[in-house]
């Protein structure tokens, strides 16, 4: 009887682990600009009961069987320095990752959650690169104070969903992930 109970518990644990692993395989998350903002979106994903894989320096060959690439755009000189790369290397990294994601049939969600405080020359360079390759865009309203996201998303034909704050990204993120068959 004891062997049966232990086997049952182990089988149940393996089933739960497999289920969690399959959920984790649906979303991969990476910063574009090396700011810490991607970590905040990982927390939002947890609120949606989704374990996204966060890879700060994700490379094209690091994509697995995910359905969605979420890239959180905000430039950080400190973050780039800690990663040992410059803005040009970061742009090349993201081009490579996005090209590989698109080739695998993945959806690309670009997010900017830092508001006006995360905008500046460096971030704007990354925004110019990111918006045209997005399938959808979620932007905290303060981040579009000058209409840059609106202009770029209209030029690229990308739907932009606003959020009042980082906390308020939960609903638009949920909406996008449902639409894309992840939730």
Give short role names for the model-derived ranges.
Residues 45-65:
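A short, well-structured beta->alpha microelement
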Residues 119-151:
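Structural recognition of alpha->loop->beta junctions
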Residues 24, 139-183:
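Charged, low-complexity C-terminal accessory regions
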Residues 1-10:
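Bacterial N-terminal signal peptides that target proteins for export
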Residues 81-104, 153-160:
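A short, gly/pro- and small-residue-rich
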């Amino acid at each position: 009887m004891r062997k049966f109970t232990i086997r049952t518990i182990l089988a149940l644990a393996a089933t739960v682990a497999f289920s969690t692993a399959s959920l984790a395989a649906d979303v991969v998350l990476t910063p574009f600009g090396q700011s810490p903002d991607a970590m905040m979106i990982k927390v939002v994903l947890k609120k949606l009961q989704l374990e996204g894989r966060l890879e700060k320096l994700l490379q094209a060959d690091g994509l697995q069987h995910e359905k969605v690439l979420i890239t959180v755009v905000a430039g950080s000189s400190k973050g780039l320095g800690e990663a040992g790369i410059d803005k040009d290397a970061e742009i090349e990294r993201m081009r490579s990752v996005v090209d590989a994601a698109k080739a695998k049939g993945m959806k690309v969600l670009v997010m900017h959650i830092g508001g006006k405080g995360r905008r500046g020359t460096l971030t704007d360079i990354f925004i110019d690169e990111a918006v045209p390759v997005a399938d959808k865009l979620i932007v905290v309203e303060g981040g579009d104070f000058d209409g840059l996201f609106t202009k770029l998303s209209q030029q690229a034909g990308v739907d932009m969903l606003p959020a009042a704050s980082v906390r308020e990204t939960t609903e638009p993120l949920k909406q996008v992930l449902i639409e894309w068959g992840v939730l």
